[in-house]
């Protein structure tokens, strides 16, 4: 019975051809063990941690401003003609055209005249003298070529331009007189330039034609007197002599043929306490006894030493 249950012997030729096929799990385990180990294999979550964390030494990046959206004008669906805006219209006007527009508006609406006067900037001495010089240039360019420039024919050619210049002079002069002009130096500067322009007006062969210029000299002399008296109230008139206005007015009087003598007399009385002389030769020589000469030379008070009283 035991012999029947015994395992039959295995023939020898079965042992020669037996091959053990390795399992897939063992080969993969051996191959993974033979590979070089990387840092990611030890701690796979460390890479994620380092990538999510901010570097401590990296500089902070300033936020970039977002670009503003450009406002693009859309084309009008229906284009049609329209007048210019006021700002564009004023850009096309030159000085003469703009002056004409303002003048016509003030004529039609007189209440605007006061508004324009208060809104416009105050004219300076240079701007006023420039206007007078423009009138003078127009006058000089109107003389006939050749012939006698002081004849009646030449006078008739330029008569209107002379009237325009003298009218402008009569309008500008009161503007620079006190009390409308508070600065004496500004008033004197204007009168100096206006008198120079008046000197350059032509003299005519016919004495009657010179009447307009002679009247203008009388008016400018009165203006000098007003300013000189106002300057005499401020600091005793020292500004007149310190600025050399005594010499300038004396020169104007000589050029005008003595027609500014009244202004010279008023100036002499205003500067009488200072020992000033209105004669040009004496003033240019520099009288050592005058207070002005002593102040400018630094010798004022040197001839009279200071007396010290006893205690």
From Swiss-Prot:
GO molecular function, one term: proteasome binding
Localization annotation: Cytoplasm; Nucleus
Compositionally biased tracts (Polar residues): 278-287, 296-311
Regions of compositional bias (Low complexity) in chain numbering: 21-32, 52-70
Ranges for region Disordered: 1-84, 277-311
The keyword Protein transport is assigned to this record: yes
Pfam families the record matches: Cut8
Gene Ontology cellular component annotations, sorted alphabetically: cytoplasm; nuclear membrane
Stored InterPro entries: Cut8/Sts1_fam, Cut8/Sts1_sf
Record's keyword terms, sorted: Cytoplasm, Nucleus, Protein transport, Transport
GO biological process, one term: proteasome localization
General function of this protein: Involved in ubiquitin-mediated protein degradation. Regulatory factor in the ubiquitin/proteasome pathway that controls the turnover of proteasome substrates. Targets proteasomes to the nucleus and facilitates the degradation of nuclear proteins.
Similarity section: Belongs to the cut8/STS1 family.
Identification of the protein by name: Tethering factor for nuclear proteasome STS1
Species this chain originates from: Paracoccidioides brasiliensis (strain Pb18)
Higher taxonomy: Eukaryota, Fungi, Dikarya, Ascomycota, Pezizomycotina
Gene: STS1
């Amino acid at each position: 019975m035991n012999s029947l249950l015994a395992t039959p012997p295995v023939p020898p030729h079965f042992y020669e051809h037996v091959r053990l096929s390795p399992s897939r799990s063992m080969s993969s385990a051996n191959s993974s063990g033979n590979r070089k180990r990387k840092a990611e294999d030890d701690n796979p979550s460390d890479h994620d941690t380092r990538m999510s964390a901010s570097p401590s030494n990296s500089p902070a990046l300033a936020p970039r401003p977002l670009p503003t959206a450009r406002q693009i004008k859309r084309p009008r669906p229906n284009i049609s003609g329209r007048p210019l805006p006021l700002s564009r219209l004023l850009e096309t006007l030159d000085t003469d055209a703009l002056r004409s527009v303002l003048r016509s508006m003030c004529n039609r609406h007189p209440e605007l005249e006061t508004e324009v006067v208060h809104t416009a900037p105050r004219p300076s001495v240079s701007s006023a003298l420039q206007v007078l010089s423009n009138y003078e240039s127009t006058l000089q360019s109107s003389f006939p070529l050749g012939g006698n420039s002081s004849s009646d024919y030449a006078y008739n050619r330029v008569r209107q331009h002379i009237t325009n210049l003298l009218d402008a002079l009569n309008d500008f002069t009161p503007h620079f007189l006190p009390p409308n002009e508070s600065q004496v130096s500004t008033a004197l500067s204007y009168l100096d330039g206006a008198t120079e322009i008046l000197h350059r007006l032509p003299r005519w062969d016919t004495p009657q034609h010179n009447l307009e210029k002679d009247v203008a000299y009388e008016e400018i002399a009165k203006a000098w007197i007003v300013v000189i008296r106002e300057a005499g109230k401020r600091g005793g008139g020292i500004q007149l002599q310190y600025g050399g206005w005594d010499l300038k007015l004396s020169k104007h009087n000589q050029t005008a043929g003595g027609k500014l003598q009244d202004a010279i007399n008023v100036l002499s009385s205003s500067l009488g306490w200072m020992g000033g002389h209105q004669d040009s030769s004496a003033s240019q020589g520099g009288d050592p006894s005058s207070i002005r000469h002593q102040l400018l030379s630094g010798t004022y008070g040197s001839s009279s030493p200071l007396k010290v009283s006893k205690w």
